[in-house]
Amino acid sequence: GNALISNNEALDETYKHLNDLASGARQAIPTGYCDLDRALNGGLRNGGLYYLAARPGGGKTQMSLQIMDNAAKQGIRVLYISLEMTETELTERRLCVTGGLTLNQLEHPDADAWKKIASASQALYDRPIQFNRISRMSVALIERLARQSKAELIIIDYLGLIQHGQGKSIYEKVTATSNNLKIT
C-alpha cells in the first residue's frame, strides 16, 4: 500500500468511517466470549492484530477455533491458518465441542456418538471458513491466501512457526512476523 495519505484522503476516509458507524455497519467481530468482547469494546476490530498467549496446552487452539466458529456462524468469512494441525484434526476438535463428544467417542463411535457426529456436522456445515493445507508459511503467502479467500477474519495458529529470515530467537521471529503482519 501507499505509505502516505493526503489530508483530503484522511478526511474522506474518516467521513466514510463515521457514516458507517451511523448506519450501523459492523464495527467489531464478536468473539463469543462476553468478558473478552466487553474488554475489546464489542470484539475484534477491522485491521486489528490480536494475540492469544498461554502456556503449551493452555487451550489457545480451542479458543481460536471457538472464535472462528462464532464469527463464521454470523456469516463472517474466516481464514484459519494452522501450522501445527491439519484441517481434519481441527475439524475433529470442532465436532467434539459441538457434539458434546470426547475424542475417544469421536474416534470409536457407537450408534449414539454417530448421531451426535451427524448433528454436529450439520450444525457446522456451510460456514464460510477456509483452512490452509500448506504447513510452511511466510507472511507473503498469508497475504496471498487472505486476498484469495476474501477473509474478514484471519486466525494464525501459531506465529512462532511462520517462516521468517530475520532473527534467531522465537521472540525475534515473532516480533519480525508481527511487524510484517501489522503493516499489511
Residue ranges and their predicted role:
Residues 2-101:
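The Walker A/P-loop phosphate-binding site
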Residues 38, 62, 70-150, 164:
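Cytosolic-facing regulatory segments adjacent to core modules
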Residues 51, 153-155:
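Structural motif
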Residues 67, 142, 181:
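Aromatic/hydrophobic pocket-lining residues that form π-stacking "cages" and hydrophobic walls in ligand
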Residues 158:
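Walker B catalytic acidic pair
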Residues 161:
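Residues immediately C-terminal
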Residues 167-172:
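Short glycine/threonine-rich loop-to-helix capping motif typified by GTGT followed
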Residues 173-184:
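Substrate-engagement module of ASCE P-loop NTPases
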